[in-house]
């Protein structure tokens, strides 16, 4: 019936075999086919870029995205799993620029946009085969053949439909705004793209500049950390309520104005200056000053070169006075509020100065700092120069500094729908839950309008055509519409093709498309519609696939994909795009740094899989804090530990069962009975049925952490209690009902556990199932229904009894370990103290098991722990400090003097009076901290409501029995070393030894039974291994098969 199972398994090889089995038998396809026509469970797969290989950061969401669909399929749902590829955008273009050796907008245009886009199309799916191989090797079932690509014309057309819907609702507008801009990519970025990048500590020059007040010999001292913005200065800002001082600088003989609190930052000696007057910033409002550069003098008539009040000014840094240029969001807002100045941006696409700033023409802004400082110093405008250490954003694609500048861009009016966004967020089940009100909720509360246009080439073109004469705009929402407007056949929607599509307007002009392409995050957010070519196809079925039942990605997507899905879902349908989401944290290297090839601080993921197996890696990731959106410091040793402590014990349980089932020719019946008389059988079956309830509940709630914890607890109970305590039932030679019940129970437990584990570790579960399944069973474990609990076999009473016994056992083992008393050394007595009468009754029933487990001769059950210990007390300062005040010290001394009987009264609820002068205080149990002193030879430990004590006195008789148990253990180890089968009978060879002679006189029968030794023989020539029974007691043994 069952195949023989090797004790030592090569799990990576087993997994390769299972992959072949799945592939040869089309198991994934069959799992889908058998659910066709069933209720649909919708899962959206966030599209990755295929311009790089998957890493550990991809493995976490991909494991989660395998577990939930497998589980839902086993629950009877039809779950489409179509992979997607993000094929447009900056990541692709940047890779092509590196490949071609070109950089920036101008060089791309010279190379030719059509040629450039052809290269993008070639490179975009460079690693798709590697992705397929790695994702499938991880054990994830996903359909690559029916996957979508954002560059497909059907996908792009649906994105146009989404855009036009937002446009028609008044949610799309074009405007100048200060935006984060990537000089290397020559395009603006969205706020959440900035957050995807890194903020680095940088040392920038910090300047204090003198601005001369018009018609006066007085200077405003203004501060900046961006010298390159000074040529574009158009104003100065002060704080309305901040106090400023006009001082006379005795050394330079100049009158200066700065924040009163900042004078000491600029003058060490109070005698170096004289304060002329003090006033609020509001008195500076409207004062004119002389520009320090003459590049934009024409703006003077429009309100430039004046002082304005602003609410963001502080005296934390600088002078309390700030220079204003249209390169900061707040600066831009102040200029718009107080002036009519034009939008000034003397920078080209690569953030180099244009001819408008002729003295610094051609210099990249950051490189211009030095020359600008020299210029100001030469003309006596520089008052002070320092360095300023601060965090500055760098582009997430180029690792180059981001520049903030005024840009004409297309926006989604997010602020207009902010209330709806927050309402929609309330419908989403976030896992972990804190993200709803926390990171994601806060991001929505502070959401700004989304800049969706990119001045790039490889992307989905913004479908707006503008009349060259009147400026009239037409937004196009489909190919058909564009064909009707232009009279041309549309075969491709990319920029190099679509920009050629123009048509005459009625006003004598020409409709020409606006030059920008869409932010690729807009496409990702449109994925629910575009991947189904909605509404041009799948319109009737759309209500079944939107919103998604489930999605999963990393924490960074709270400001990426989760955000854009939510914006577009809310904008289109006032609904969430997804109902449930599991968010994982970052996977870092073991040193806490970002994983990097250049740092060489992580092992190649495929090497990990080929060493430990994908199941071990999956389990390691899912068990870790990363599933709760926390960071994980990845370690190969962590995966090794999972293999050792979980995967191998599962295999050992399976190996144990098959070994004895083969010997006894056990054959499972079709209708296996769960009605058992043995309490161990009843208990493990009850625990298994309870586990089913927990898993169905917790996975339905997307709580993978609780699910895994419950599974691991059961594996521990099965291996370390049920199997260990049932061994002799399998060993005995007669095939009675008890032995058959043990076989049936263990068979049912292992097989059912494998089905429960299948979504989590699909390989080992399949391997074990293939050997355990009967002719009536499904072809693959993954074609089974997910097990539901049989309430008739849940017995909470027996669970409580055995779990109490396990708790007492665990406490006793801890106590032994604490006092260096080996488990094989018998102890005369254990005392168990509990006031709970029900627990006392259960302990009486479980007494025999407990004594056997912890190797104790007698158990005494007590109601009061004072029979084992005497008490001392210390003051609980945390509690008493609030009540006693100055009397605390005196009362503390009195508490330390309390007698044992006084403390017992307090424990029993009788308050104890302490007098201090005329005051009386009454102590309760919360007011003291108990200390326990053990009586006589007792060693005591307390855990919650239970206290146990063991008698540590070891008599000679007990000591001899302990040596016997150690002797048996050493023989068993030798059996393993020699690869003897568990059922092999042996001859045991010993030397002439006084201690052994004493042991054999008392325990020969026990030794033979435990080691399957038929004969114990004195024979020096057969001795092979020296063993240590205890400290200096050595002997030599040998064994051979009979």
From Swiss-Prot:
Primary site of residence: cytoplasm
List of residues binding ATP: 597
Cofactor(s) this protein requires: Zn(2+)
GO cellular component: cytoplasm
One Pfam family matching this protein: DUF5915
Catalytic reaction equation(s): tRNA(Ile) + L-isoleucine + ATP = L-isoleucyl-tRNA(Ile) + AMP + diphosphate
Keywords: Aminoacyl-tRNA synthetase, ATP-binding, Cytoplasm, Ligase, Metal-binding, Nucleotide-binding, Protein biosynthesis, Zinc
Motif interval(s): 'KMSKS' region: 594-598
Domain topic, free-text comment: IleRS has two distinct active sites: one for aminoacylation and one for editing. The misactivated valine is translocated from the active site to the editing site, which sterically excludes the correctly activated isoleucine. The single editing site contains two valyl binding pockets, one specific for each substrate (Val-AMP or Val-tRNA(Ile)).
Family to which this protein belongs: Belongs to the class-I aminoacyl-tRNA synthetase family. IleS type 2 subfamily.
Name of the protein in question: Isoleucine--tRNA ligase
Gene name of this polypeptide: ileS
